[in-house]
Amino acid sequence: LLSRGLGDVYKRQLLLKYPGTNCDAETERALRAAGFSTQIQPIATATPEHVAKSQLVVLGGGFSYGDYVTSGRLAQLETERFLGDALHRHHAGGGLLLGICNGFQILTKLGILPDSSLIDNKKERFECVWAKLVKVAKNSPFLQGLPDEFELPSAHAEGRLVTRPGDAEKYLAAGNVALQYVDNRDGCECSIAGLQDSTGRAMGLMPHPERFLLPRHHYDKDWAGNEDWGWGYFLFKSAFDALK
């Protein structure tokens, strides 16, 4: 079944791995299913050349460096050290950037996504739930294949998005909000579940698309959203289709 998503021409993708991230295998599997030629690269050995050869760069989920300072902070410093300029060149040159969960936290700290922070959930504890989402950014290259409402697994302790006063509303008006929660469990400002930059080529989201690749990954065995694929697959496939 997984081979059914493969295109005739592979597109290169770089998946950055940090100490403590734990979704690398699932994310690689989803990317390959969508058609990408995927390379998992530890951040300690990643080079600007790895980025330059890739059309999509993904920062995956987990607990980079154990989240010992704040989520994504140490990973951000290491990413800036090894790849900061390369990632900005990649983005400016038309490449795609995707941050999932911890990767979203890292992208906000790198300044690639609109200024914001992801802090402790409203309930001040780790929660693993399914999140119902609304697609806000209709022009996002990552969301074209998804319906207006869908759901994905979510698992984090620091996923409450906060901004400077009034900024969340500005992001919503400016088209920077990619996804919103239907049930805003984390207490995010404007119910924001995902942000994108002004071009749409960089996006971050807290829920995990790689964890809903196939219909059998859904909690309801009778889920009838799609016969062959879970909603997460279509996020990666949308990115694949968007690349020339």
Locate each region found by the language model.
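Amide-donor transfer/coupling interface in amidating biosynthetic enzymes
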Residues: A44-T47, K53, A86-R89, L118-K244
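Alpha-helix C-terminal capping/helix-to-coil transition sites in glycosyltransferase folds
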Residues: G5, A52-K53, G93
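N-terminal cofactor/phosphate-binding cores enriched in small/glycine residues
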Residues: L56-G61, G66-D67
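A structural preference for short, hydrophobic beta-strand core positions in alpha/beta folds
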Residues: I40-Q41
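Single conserved hydrophobic/aromatic residue that forms the stacking wall/gate
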Residues: L1-Y10
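Cysteine-nucleophile active-site neighborhood
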Residues: Y65-S140
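Short, charged N-terminal beta->alpha structural module
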Residues: K11-A34
